[in-house]
Amino acid sequence: MNRHLFILILLLLSCSNNAIEKKNLIKVQHPVSNISSAACVDFNSLNNKILNGLVQRDKALKEIQILLPKLRSYFYDNGGKDFTKASWVFPLEGYNSSVIGGENGSGYIASGYDYFDGNKHKGHPAQDIFIIDKNRDCLDDKKKKLVNVLSMTGGIVIATETVWDTTSNLRGGKYIWIYDPSSNSFFYYAHNSNVLVRPCDIIEPGETIATVGRTGLSAFKKRSPTHLHFMQLKLDKNNYPRPFNCYKDLISIMSKT
């Protein structure tokens, strides 16, 4: 086996094993109502179809338009709350906006991006948020432990991917999509080591939803520093998910230590 490939596999296994050990320590808020969770399951399924190019754009948009009212009802009926930006939390525990890649948010490139292009999308309408991890083992070099990914907003988990390996062409690796009815936005957290939530979970700002990892087509390669890929899509009047640069929000909100 190629020596460099062997090292990459060892690092990925280290990230994954460390995350699994941490998982049992995290408390996740699960809905308690008996109301059907079909809308969450359906959105997760739709997202998978979009990723794999198995559904046409117009049909996918119509499905989203049908699912959103059901998701909102499920959210509020199961104790979901609206939170203003004053309650939002920086998405990496123990870090702040100084670790956002680029200069003044320059890593954000919306041109060419369309959610409905799935795994073949163009652009980079997101902020990459880096941890201190020079040896690429998914551990903070100073604290020698995993870094928790926190939900920036409140919302409901609508899609996740919890399985990934180096043979996959999935760019986001292990990811989470959260719908926040308050801001009418989808929030995307990608390249995670371990996903700690599931579709239909009701989330509040600052809750641990994952640990930072190196999963994804490019993110697992040694040349890529360990980071969270964080994106916000705002829904327009037709509920079309449009890229929104949340850099100003990221630099203004408080970090959780």
Residue ranges and their predicted role:
Residues 15-148, 249-257:
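Polar/charged, compositionally biased leader and regulatory segments
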Residues 127-141, 185, 190-192, 232-241:
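Small beta-barrel nucleic-acid-binding modules, principally OB-folds
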Residues 118, 138-141, 165-170, 219-224:
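Short consensus segments that form the blades of beta-propeller domains
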Residues 125, 143-146, 150-196, 226-227:
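Zn2+-dependent peptidoglycan hydrolase active-site motif and core
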Residues 135-136, 163-166, 183-185, 194-196, ...:
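Solvent-exposed loop/turn segments at secondary-structure junctions
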Residues 169-178, 201-257:
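Conserved, short, structured surface segments that act as functional micro-motifs
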Residues 4-13:
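Sec-dependent N-terminal signal peptides
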